[in-house]
Regions:
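Acidic, Gly/Ser/Thr-rich repeat motifs that build Ca2+-stabilized beta-propeller blades
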Residues: 138-301, 360-363, 368-376, 429-474, ...
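Intrinsically disordered, low-complexity Pro/Gly/Ser/Thr-rich segments with frequent PxxP/GP/PP motifs
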Residues: 77-106
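Surface-exposed loop and turn segments in beta-propeller and other repeat-based domains
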Residues: 193-209, 264-280, 329-351, 395-428, ...
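Short acidic/proline- and small/hydrophobic-mixed sequence motifs that coincide with surface turns
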Residues: 61-65
Length: 529
C-alpha cells in the first residue's frame, strides 16, 4: 500500500600539553569505501595559539609507535621550532589530534608535519604560515595543491543560498537569497526584477542568523520545453507546536517573459512540519534517472532527540532522509518503483536514510554518483556517496565515530550494515561542510575529477570559510587539499554554497555576515589551475 507523507515533522546547525588525543576507534567498513592495507595521512594543520595537526590511519590494520614531529623552517622562531612525540597505537580507520601548545616568532615560516609508524607507513605535509609573536596564521592552501582563482561577479545579495542554471541553453545563472528572492544573472549583470519572490510566503527570519528560508531551487530536465521548476522554503505552520513548515513546491515560468516566473502557479507537493529552527536540509536536484531528489534534515535540535529513536533511523518519518520523487506522474507526485521501501515497512518516498542535515548534494555529471555532504553534530563533518537504500548512520554514528552506538542494539542494526563516509574531517578544521561538485568542466583540466567543496567557517564570530577539494587515488581513498589562493589571501568570508553553469564550470556563494541583515552576499566564479 502506498505510504504517503502528510504534514510530517522535520527541521542546519550550519549550522599546556604537547599531545591531545580524541576519537580513536576501529570500525568495520561499508561497501563504498575501498581500502587496501594501512595508510597514514596528515590531514590538516590549523594555527592560532600554537598549532594543531591531525594524523589519520585510513587503512584497516592498526599502526603502532607513530613517531611524529612538527618543524618550523624560515622566519625567526624563538620557541617551538621543533616538537616531537609518539603515538603508541593508531587503530584502523581512526585519527588522533596532535598539538604544539605555543609557537613564538616573527615572519613567514614553513610548517612541516611528518609522521612514521613502526610498520613503515609515513606521511608528510607542509603549509606556509605567518608568525606574529604568539599568533600563528596558516596561509591558504597546501604545498603542491591546485590554485583557485576566484573572481567576484555579483554582490549586494542578502544571504544567497542557491546558485544553479536552468539547463535551457540560455547561459543564465539563477541565484536564490535566503530571504526568498530569486534573481537572474544574465549577460554579465543581475536583472533588477526578481525571477520570483517568495518572501511573503515565508516564515519571518532572524536577520542575524537563521537556518530557515529559501534553501532549494532546481529546474526540470526538460525546462526548456515545459517551464517547470521547484523550490524548497520555510513557511509558517498552522500547528503552534511546530517551528515552521518546509515546503516543496512546483512553479511555472511566465508564458510571456522567460526571465520572470508565474507567481500564481505554485503547486505544493510536500509540506513538512518542523519542530526546530535548524537542520532543514533543502537541497533539490534531478538525478540522471530523471527523478527529483530532496534532502531533509533530522528535525533539528542537538542529538536527534525527537521521538524514542530520533528521526534519522526512523523509516516511518521523512526527517533525516534523502527522498526520491517522480514529479512527472501521480498526484502530486509518483514513487519510483525501485525506491527501497516500496511494498514494505517504511515511507515509499525514502531513497536513503540516517542523515543529520544533508544540506547540500550533487550528482557527478559523468558517473551519476550522488555526493551528499552531511553536516555533523559536535566533532565530525562528512561526505558520503549515497546509494539506494543506504543507511548512513546518524545518530548511531557521527562520521566514522560512535555517537549513540546503543541505538544500533535497540534497532538490531549491525555496524557492518551501515554506509560510512568516503571522507570526514574534525571540527578543528571547520564547523559545517558545504557540499560542492565533482568538477567535470573544460576550463580547468587539472581539476577534472576533483570534488570541490568548502567549509562554512572555522568560527562563528569571524568569517573563516575554507575552499577545498578531494582527489581519489587508485585504491578508492579520498585525500583532502586546500586550494592555494592568489596572493595568499584568505577568503575572510562565510561560504554558503556552490553551483554549476550549463558547461559545468563552478561558482561559489559567500557572505561576510551570518544573516540577511546586510547585503553582504557575493557570487564568485572559480577557475582552477
Amino acid at each position: 500500500m502506498r505510504k504517503k507523507i502528510v504534514g510530517i515533522v522535520f527541521s542546519v546547525s550550519l549550522l599546556l600539553t604537547s599531545v591531545i588525543t580524541i576519537g580513536t576507534i576501529s570500525l568495520p567498513k561499508s561497501e563504498n569505501i575501498l581500502l587496501s592495507g594501512s595508510s597514514l595521512q596528515v590531514e590538516v594543520i590549523t594555527g592560532g595559539l600554537g598549532l594543531t595537526a591531525i594524523l589519520r590511519n585510513t587503512g584497516k590494520e592498526n599502526l603502532t609507535q607513530i613517531n611524529w614531529d612538527i618543524t618550523c623552517n624560515g622566519g625567526l622562531v624563538i620557541l617551538g621550532k621543533k616538537t616531537t612525540g609518539t603515538i603508541p597505537l593508531l587503530r584502523g580507520d581512526s585519527s588522533e589530534i596532535i598539538k604544539v601548545p605555543l609557537i613564538i616568532g616573527f615572519g613567514k615560516t614553513s610548517i612541516t608535519v611528518t609522521a612514521q609508524a613502526a610498520e613503515g607507513d609515513d606521511a608528510i605535509k607542509t603549509n606556509q604560515a605567518n608568525l606574529l609573536g604568539i599568533f600563528l596564521k596558516i596561509l591558504p592552501g597546501d604545498a603542491g595543491a591546485l590554485t583557485a582563482t576566484i573572481q567576484k561577479i555579483m554582490q549586494g545579495l542578502r544571504s544567497p543560498t542557491v546558485i544553479t542554471n536552468a539547463g535551457d541553453q540560455s547561459n543564465r545563472l539563477i541565484i536564490g537569497e535566503q530571504t526568498g528572492k530569486i534573481f537572474i544573472y544574465k549577460n554579465g549583470s543581475r536583472l533588477t526584477t526578481p525571477f520570483l519572490d517568495l518572501s511573503t510566503k515565508m516564515v519571518k527570519l532572524s536577520k542575524i542568523y537563521d537556518e530557515r528560508g529559501l534553501l532549494g531551487l532546481t529546474f526540470h530536465p526538460d525546462y526548456e520545453n515545459n517551464g517547470r521548476f521547484f523550490v524548497y522554503y520555510s513557511a509558517p505552520s498552522s500547528d503552534p507546536n511546530l517551528n515552521c513548515d518546509s515546503i516543496l513546491a512546483e512553479y511555472q515560468v511566465s508564458s510571456e517573459n522567460p526571465d520572470v516566473a508565474d507567481s500564481s502557479s505554485e503547486k505544493i507537493l510536500v509540506r513538512i512540519g518542523e519542530p526546530e529552527m535548524n537542520h532543514k536540509g533543502g537541497q533539490l536536484a534531478f538525478g540522471p534517472d530523471g527523478y527529483l531528489y530532496v534532502g531533509v534534515g533530522d528535525g533539528g535540535g542537538a542529538g536527534d532527540q525527537h521521538g524514542t529513536i530520533g528521526n534519522g533511523q526512523n523509516i516511518s518519518t521523512i526527517l533525516g532522509k534523502i527522498l526520491r520523487l517522480d514529479v512527472d506522474t501521480g498526484t502530486p507526485y509518483g514513487i519510483p518503483s525501485d525506491n527501497p521501501f516500496v511494498g514494505q515497512e517504511g515511507l515509499d518516498e525514502i531513497y536513503a536514510y540516517g542523515f543529520r542535515n544533508p544540506y547540500r548534494f550533487s550528482f557527478d555529471r559523468e558517473s551519476g554518483r550522488l555526493f551528499v555532504a552531511d553536516v555533523g553534530q559536535d566533532l565530525w563533518e562528512e561526505l558520503d556517496i549515497v546509494i539506494n537504500g543506504g543507511n548512513y548512520g546518524w545518530r548511531i554514528m557521527e562520521g566514522n565515530h560512535p555517537y549513540d552506538p546503543a541505538l544500533a542494539t535497540t534497532l538490531n542494526i549491525s555496524l557492518e550494515s551501515l554506509q560510512y563516509p568516503i571522507f570526514e574531517y574534525s571540527h578543528d578544521v571547520g564547523h559545517s561542510i558545504i557540499g560542492g561538485y565533482l568538477y567535470q568542466g573544460s576550463s580547468s583540466p587539472d581539476a577534472v575529477g576533483s570534488y570541490v567543496f568548502g567549509d562554512w567557517s572555522t568560527g562563528f564570530l569571524k568569517p573563516g570559510g575554507k575552499l577545498y577539494y578531494l582527489q581519489e587515488n587508485t585504491s578508492g581513498v579520498w585525500h583532502r587539499f586546500e586550494f592555494n589562493l592568489i596572493k595568499d589571501r584568505p577568503l575572510n568570508r562565510f561560504i554558503l554554497g556552490f553551483g554549476e553553469d550549463e558547461s559545468g564550470e563552478l561558482y561559489m556563494l559567500t557572505s561576510w555576515a551570518t544573516g540577511s541583515l546586510l547585503p553582504s552576499g557575493e557570487v564568485w566564479s572559480i577557475k582552477i589551475e
